[in-house]
Amino acid sequence: MEEREGGFRKETVERLLRLHFRDGRTRVNGDALLLMAELLKVFVREAAARAARQAQAEDLEKVDIEHVEKVLPQLLLDFV
């Protein structure tokens, strides 16, 4: 199976960041956007991997949202 390289577009990351800016004049450096995009990509991949392991631990072949919800608290703590 060929692995497809994916990620978040800079525009998407900037919009996500702007949702939490208090000052509308706040600017984000292009390098910071690339770094945040990479962090989001790693976070999503790790969430998917942990959810898959959780499903396997429950002897299930399909990952469901409940598996993501079970691993999310520890995942967030690991990324802080």
UniProtKB/Swiss-Prot annotation:
Spell out the protein name for this chain: Centromere protein X
Top-level taxon of the source organism: Eukaryota
Which of UniProt's keywords are assigned here?
A: Cell cycle, Cell division, Centromere, Chromosome, DNA damage, DNA repair, DNA-binding, Kinetochore, Mitosis, Nucleus
Q: Name one GO biological process term.
A: resolution of meiotic recombination intermediates
Q: Where in the cell is it found?
A: Nucleus; Chromosome, Centromere; Chromosome, Centromere, Kinetochore
Say where the protein is mainly found. nucleus
Q: Which GO terms describe its cellular component?
A: FANCM-MHF complex; Fanconi anaemia nuclear complex; kinetochore
Encoding gene (name): CENPX
Task: Tell me the protein family, please.
Answer: Belongs to the CENP-X/MHF2 family.
Q: How does it assemble?
A: Heterodimer with CENPX, sometimes called MHF; this interaction stabilizes both partners. MHF heterodimers can assemble to form tetrameric structures. MHF also coassemble with CENPT-CENPW heterodimers at centromeres to form the tetrameric CENP-T-W-S-X complex. Forms a discrete complex with FANCM and CENPX, called FANCM-MHF; this interaction, probably mediated by direct binding between CENPS and FANCM, leads to synergistic activation of double-stranded DNA binding and strongly stimulates FANCM-mediated DNA remodeling.
Q: Which InterPro entries match?
A: CENP-X, Histone-fold
Annotated function: DNA-binding component of the Fanconi anemia (FA) core complex. Required for the normal activation of the FA pathway, leading to monoubiquitination of the FANCI-FANCD2 complex in response to DNA damage, cellular resistance to DNA cross-linking drugs, and prevention of chromosomal breakage. In complex with CENPS (MHF heterodimer), crucial cofactor for FANCM in both binding and ATP-dependent remodeling of DNA. Stabilizes FANCM. In complex with CENPS and FANCM (but not other FANC proteins), rapidly recruited to blocked forks and promotes gene conversion at blocked replication forks.
Q: Which Pfam families match?
A: CENP-X
Entries under PANTHER family matching the protein: CENTROMERE PROTEIN X (PTHR28680:SF1)
Q: What are the GO MF terms of this UniProt record?
A: DNA binding; protein heterodimerization activity
